[in-house]
Amino acid sequence: MKPENPTIEICPGITRRTVANGETMYQMLATLASGSRMPEHSHSQEQIVHILEGKMRLIVDGVPHELSNGDSFYLASNVPHGVETLSATRVLDTFSPPRKDYLAIDEKVRQEVL
């Protein structure tokens, strides 16, 4: 992870930081406070969620799935999903194709710091 990659708040209690990206993949580390929620959303990228530590409820198309340390979950593109954390949680998220929206925000924040 490059030290210049900024930490960005996605929604209250949830931050992300770009770990790596390439032509066809994007990876980020998300940190979620206990009790935080990410509203239901969808995106065109496929996503793999890997729980590094903690416990959360991933709600996929209205169906809850409890995930904890070491669990992974695949999300197809455009599938509605949201998150409720059950404890402080760290997640490694991988997307394909890359999240160009997130990379653009990273670049904007870096430019504001200069």
Give the residues covered by each predicted segment:
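A short, N-terminal "cap"/entry segment at the start of jelly-roll beta-barrel domains
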Residues: 1-24, 104-114
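Conserved short histidine dyad/triad with adjacent acidic residue
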Residues: 12, 28-42
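Short, conserved beta-strand element in jelly-roll/cupin
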Residues: 31-33, 43-58
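Short beta-strand segments in beta-sandwich/barrel cores
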Residues: 37-38, 54-59, 73
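Structural motif
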Residues: 48, 55-57, 64, 80, ...
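A cytosolic small-molecule/anion-sensing beta-strand core signal
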Residues: 52-53, 68, 87
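Short acidic-glycine-tyrosine-enriched beta hairpin
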Residues: 62-77
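Ligand-binding loop in jelly-roll beta-barrel domains
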Residues: 77-101
